[in-house]
């Protein structure tokens, strides 16, 4: 069997294979806190990759989607005393609502103009959060997002324990992977790829370009909002920097490291970036310079990303 045919046969099962890897990942990853961060940041990059990798829209405003979800979850839990599951649902919904608002204003622009509009709107949300001290904590962040124990189907889960917390987060990430797989396998997934490859031809085929872009942005916001909610529960705090433009840059970096337009690439990129950050920061306070150099080298020598290059090698 040709390798490309073998990969094609595995594609319908990619969500199951990715989920299996995430389930066994803690067995050979000794640092469980980093493993949880990889899950959350990978989910954030996955949301960005849906828009950039599969539709070709470069956004510099995805920090607003992550931060919107994180703040919504934190406010619901801290200010209103709601249970964790309402916090997570609120965070996911908030990410979609923020994306709907930003997308409605940005989707009719193109290229660098689209990126700049998303950046500007995201920075507006950052300054709103910075000033709304009573709700967001301002520059000190929203503290007290404490979820120590969770009762699920009569079973008490102590998510203070690192391994339990990992699988708690992994359950939502795995669900997101299956949702993404269904989206990509649907007619809408085919429409996204058609628009990315040739917008003029896609319009001639009857696709509503603006509506498709807006819907993709909203779906991307759902994944990012979920990541933000999980991050708020994991950290117990929502730093205002979550909304800052540098957070959007991390999504871009992790996606390009792993492989733009690949299913599991965002998690590979998140793992490489976070492990590099953890190791290099032990050696020098200038770790960002070295990690940036590694990123540039990867982009130059592996333009398809690490995971994308591996898949391309198997397809030959």
Please give the residue ranges for each predicted region.
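Residue-level recognition of pore/gate-forming positions within transmembrane alpha-helices
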Residues: 23, 41-42, 70-71, 92-96, ...
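Alpha-helical transmembrane segments within multi-pass membrane transporters and channels
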Residues: 80-123, 268-270
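Single transmembrane alpha-helix segments in multi-pass membrane proteins
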Residues: 26-79, 105-114, 118, 194-195, ...
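Helix-loop-helix "hairpin" substructures at the membrane interface of multi-pass membrane proteins
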Residues: 160-239
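Extracellular/periplasmic helix-loop junction at the C-terminal end of a transmembrane helix
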Residues: 121-158, 189, 307-309
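Cytosolic-side transmembrane-helix boundaries in multi-pass membrane proteins
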Residues: 1-21, 141, 195-200, 204-212, ...
């Amino acid at each position: 069997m040709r390798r490309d045919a073998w990969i094609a046969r595995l594609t319908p099962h990619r969500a199951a294979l990715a989920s299996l890897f995430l389930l066994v990942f803690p067995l050979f990853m000794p640092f469980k806190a980093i493993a949880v961060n990889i899950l959350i940041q990978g989910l954030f990059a996955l949301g960005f990759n849906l828009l950039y990798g599969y539709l070709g829209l470069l956004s510099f405003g995805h920090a607003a989607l992550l931060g919107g979800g994180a703040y919504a979850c934190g406010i619901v839990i801290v200010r209103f005393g709601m249970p964790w599951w309402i916090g997570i649902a609120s965070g996911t919904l908030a990410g979609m609502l923020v994306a709907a608002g930003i997308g409605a204003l940005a989707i009719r622009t193109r290229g660098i103009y689209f990126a700049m509009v998303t950046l500007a709107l995201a920075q507006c949300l950052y300054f709103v959060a910075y000033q709304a001290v009573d709700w967001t904590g301002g520059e000190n962040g929203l503290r007290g997002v404490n979820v120590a124990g969770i009762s699920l189907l009569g079973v008490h889960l102590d998510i203070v324990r690192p391994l339990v917390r990992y699988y708690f987060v992994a359950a939502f990430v795995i669900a997101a992977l299956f949702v993404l797989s269904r989206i990509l396998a649907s007619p809408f997934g085919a429409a996204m790829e058609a628009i990315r490859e040739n917008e003029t031809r896609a319009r001639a085929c009857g696709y509503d370009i603006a509506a498709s872009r807006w819907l993709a942005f909203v779906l991307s916001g759902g994944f990012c909002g979920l990541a933000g909610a999980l991050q708020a529960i994991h950290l117990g705090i929502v730093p205002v920097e979550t909304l800052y433009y540098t957070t959007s840059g991390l999504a871009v970096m992790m996606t390009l490291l792993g492989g733009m337009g690949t299913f599991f690439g965002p998690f590979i990129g998140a793992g490489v970036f976070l492990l590099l950050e953890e190791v290099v920061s032990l050696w020098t306070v200038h770790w960002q310079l070295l990690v940036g150099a590694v990123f540039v080298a990867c982009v130059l020598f592996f333009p398809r990303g690490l995971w994308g290059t591996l898949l391309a090698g198997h397809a030959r």
